[in-house]
């Protein structure tokens, strides 16, 4: 069964959706985490059951992250989202350390799609359903400029500032 909950954050109310899982902490594997006003955000109430308790562990990790106490999430993601290429890109994004950034070109190189593949990498990153916890906010332009973010550039800038990843 698909469940959802909302969690207050410095970025506004986050919407978490998940699937029941026997192996995940709290019994729920995360399907999506959406920011307020996000392009392609999950519709929380359409056919989903409100279950705040199902996300207690995830909510606690988010609170610790937003207060600067957590630098690496330990969350089970529901399987099956994305194409093979998107999943390769998302795994590469997950490897970017807290407080660091990587360019779209660097991610393209890591997944074997250098050159023209940079645009495809950008598209795959734009389809990441797990904002914040799968840190696509850490991907920037080759020139160091902040580029697109489904949650909006102000949120991306705020997250990078929290992590100390913005150049002075």
Predicted regions span which residues?
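Short, leucine-enriched amphipathic alpha-helices that occur as contiguous helical runs
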Residues: 82, 86-90, 118
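Short helix/strand-capping hinge loops at secondary-structure junctions
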Residues: 96-99
